[in-house]
A protein has these predicted regions:
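Catalytic phosphate/metal-binding cores of nucleic-acid and nucleotide-processing enzymes, i.e., regions
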Residues: 1-135
Length: 135
C-alpha cells in the first residue's frame, strides 16, 4: 500500500445555471462563510464529483495522515494563503470522507495540516494535496 498520495485539486469550480452563464465559485473561506446555502451545496457536490474522478482507483495509506496543500495561483496577484487553502481543504476533506477514502477528518485521522505557496502557474492553477502517513 502507498505511504504517499499526491492529488491535484482545482482552486475554483463552475456551478451550472439554467438561464445565465455558469457561476465561478472560488473555494476559499470568504465564499465558504458568505455564500448562500444553495450555492454552497452545489459547489460541494461539484467538488465531490471532481475529487471522485481524481482519486478513483487510488488506495489510500492507513491513517494517521499529514496533509500538505501547495497552492499554485494563476497570477501574481497577492492572496491570503490562510483564506484559500483552508477552503479547499474543507471541501476536499468532506469529499474524501463521503467517498470512503478516509474514515473521518478529525484530529485522530488527520493529525497535521500544512499550507504552502508553490509559485505562479498560469497554465495550470491548482492546489496539490500531498497525503502522507505519520510513522
Amino acid at each position: 500500500m502507498l505511504t504517499n498520495v499526491i492529488i491535484s485539486l482545482p482552486l475554483v469550480v463552475f456551478i451550472p445555471r439554467k438561464t445565465k452563464e455558469d457561476k465561478l465559485f472560488a473555494l476559499n473561506l470568504n465564499n465558504y462563510r458568505n455564500a448562500h446555502h444553495f450555492t454552497m451545496n452545489n459547489a460541494k457536490k461539484i467538488m465531490k464529483e471532481i475529487v471522485e474522478r481524481i482519486v478513483e482507483g487510488v488506495i489510500f495509506p492507513d491513517p494517521p495522515y499529514i496533509f500538505s496543500y501547495t497552492i499554485y495561483p494563476e497570477s501574481a496577484r497577492k492572496f491570503d494563503l490562510g483564506n484559500v487553502a483552508p477552503g479547499i481543504q474543507k471541501f476536499t476533506d468532506d469529499a474524501l470522507v463521503e467517498l470512503g477514502k478516509i474514515k473521518d477528518d478529525n484530529y485522530k485521522i488527520i493529525q497535521e495540516v500544512h499550507y504552502y505557496f508553490g509559485g505562479i502557474d498560469k497554465e495550470n492553477p491548482r492546489a496539490d494535496l500531498n497525503i502522507q502517513t505519520r510513522q
